UniProtKB/Swiss-Prot annotation:
This is Hemoglobin subunit beta-1. The keyword Iron applies. Residues 2-146 form the Globin domain. Hb1 is a heterotetramer of two alpha-1 chains and two beta-1 chains. Hb2 is a heterotetramer of two alpha-2 chains and two beta-1 chains. HbC is a heterotetramer of two alpha-1 chains and two beta-2 chains. InterPro entries: Globin, Globin-like_sf, Globin/Proto, Hemoglobin_b, Hemoglobin_oxygen_transport. It comes from the Eukaryota. It comes from Eleginops maclovinus. The keyword Ligase does not apply.
Length: 146
């Protein structure tokens, strides 16, 4: 994947402005609520019976934060995203058996949460760059499935 200087700056700026403790839990909670079949991978997280329970679940919040810190690795290594996610791809495919389509669903939920947070700053150009970045991450995480 080729990245322009503008795209690199946009991704760095977006992630530099995000409060991971806020955005991470919101994105994962949204994914679990909007796509309830994704909950099957989080059985050890306890009560996920309804939206209120999911939003208030500390394990969901902690994992959402962990996901954003994982994305931070990609931000800092934009030229080697597939390589830095190789082990994580193996973990999710071989041990956890996560449906690779779920990565795209979570990426879509993250896009919505970031757009809501950024407001008018999340213009079409910014969105295009953000979604390009997430598409590369999703592809890297799904690499072991192919």
């Amino acid at each position: 994947v080729e990245w322009t200087d503008q795209e690199r700056a946009t991704i760095s700026s977006i992630f530099g402005s995000l409060d991971y403790d806020d955005i991470g839990p919101k994105a994962l909670s949204r994914c679990l609520i909007v796509y309830p079949w994704t909950q099957r991978h989080f059985g050890s997280f306890g009560n996920l019976y309804n939206a209120e329970a999911i939003i208030g679940n500390q394990k969901v919040a902690a994992h959402g934060i962990k996901v954003l810190h994982g994305l931070d690795r990609a931000v800092k290594n934009m030229d080697n995203i597939k390589e830095i996610y190789a082990e994580l791809s193996i973990l999710h495919s071989e041990k956890l058996h996560v449906d690779p389509d779920n990565f795209k669903l979570l990426a879509d939920c993250l896009t919505i949460v970031v757009a809501a947070k950024m407001g008018s700053g999340f213009n079409p150009g910014t969105q295009a760059t953000f979604q390009k970045f997430l598409a590369v991450v999703v592809s890297a995480l799904g690499k072991q499935y192919h």
